[in-house]
Amino acid sequence: MGKRDRLSGNEAVAIALRQINPDVFPAFPITPSTEIPQYFASFVANGQVDTEFIPVESEHSSMSAAIGASAAGARALTATSSCGMAYMWEELYIAASNRLPLALALVNRALSGPININCDHSDSMGARDSGWIQMYAENNQEAYDNMVQAFCISEHRDVRLPIMICQDGFITSHAVENIELLEDAEVKGFVGEYEPENYLLNPECPMAVGPYSVTDFYMEAKRNQAEGMKHVEKVVLDVAKEFAEMSGREYGLFEAYKLEDADRAVVMIGSAAGTTKDAIDKLRAQGEKVGLLKIRLYRPFPAEAIAEALKNVKAVAVMDRAEGYTNHGGPLGSDVMAAMFRARSTALATNIIYGLGGRDVRVEDMEQVFADLQTMIDNDDAGETYRYMGIRE
């Protein structure tokens, strides 16, 4: 039986990591993820974990050390945000290309510049094509639950790829909520012991990691990565089913909130989904058929399942907390619209950029989004398909 506690998102993730008891945790602090290694360091000092905690001199080094540990056969992870992630950019691709199932606790923060320490998704969206699995949390409970499930997904023999567990900086990382924790023994049994398939410290099977790859081999290596990513959706669902049996909390590739009979829908990632649910409840009480599709698994992108979930809506607003600089749409908008196009959807669609640099998202803002969708339906015209919400003109 689990217990209820009042925790910030960062502390919840740190507790999940204590329960997992990884082998190696290299870390370098950066706001707003600093508290994760800070809390974890206290667990190390108090003898609550056996983890080799390595304070390093930079984020590039923290990911490099995690890669080295994982290549040697250890269960490894690190944590970072924003410019710290940018500093380890080169290493993100190294981890993925070497099929190392390490984890990154990413607390989403705007990339500079101008310099900003608040939330948006520009850091993780910039790395969306690096070969990492990406999962996002709406609230502190989901941040904890996703972290518990992370290694079960990344270490699966059909996957063997690194995973990012993302939550919104300050909005969830520092805000305190009541959440339900699992018992330590439950998490330990659920995650299990790491059994590396190929690793450097195996005298029975000598191998090289990350050798120079010439034209004859590079493309096959990339195809191999892509094949591993194709298995992720099924593994995520299988792990979620096992997690639900243990915890009673159900997860999928996304959450469809009051979407069954909706004629207007919002698609989004992260904490603003909670605000959107409040707006939906208010509008539903007034008889309006509105709903939400909240993305949990963003990479790989579950295009077919998302298109199927949206097949009956008349108008969709895809909300991006990151600018794409394409004159076409943000990252999520481009992916969702492509999925709808392939499914031959006739729904009107628009892409809305919102919340950059931590700008607040209010219930009234989301009510206006649904009102704009109704206008699109009434006029049978999507109008401006690349918009901004809450911006001063």
Language-model features: where?
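Thiamine diphosphate
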Residues: M1-G126, G131-W132, V148, G390-R392
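Conformationally flexible catalytic loops at phosphate/diphosphate-handling active centers
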Residues: P162-E255
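Redox- and metal-dependent alpha/beta enzyme cores, enriched for Fe-S-associated oxidoreductases
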Residues: E260-E288, F301-E308
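Conserved thiamine diphosphate
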Residues: N118-P162, C166-G169, S345-R359
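Peripheral docking tails and interdomain loops at the edges
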Residues: D320-E393
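Glycine-/acidic-rich phosphate or pyrophosphate-binding loops and their flanking alpha/beta elements
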Residues: S8-V13, K241-R264, K277
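Short helix-loop-beta junction
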Residues: A41-N46, D278-L292, F341-R342
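Short acidic, glycine/serine/threonine-rich loops at helix termini
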Residues: I36-Y39, A65-I67, M88-L92, G113-C119, ...
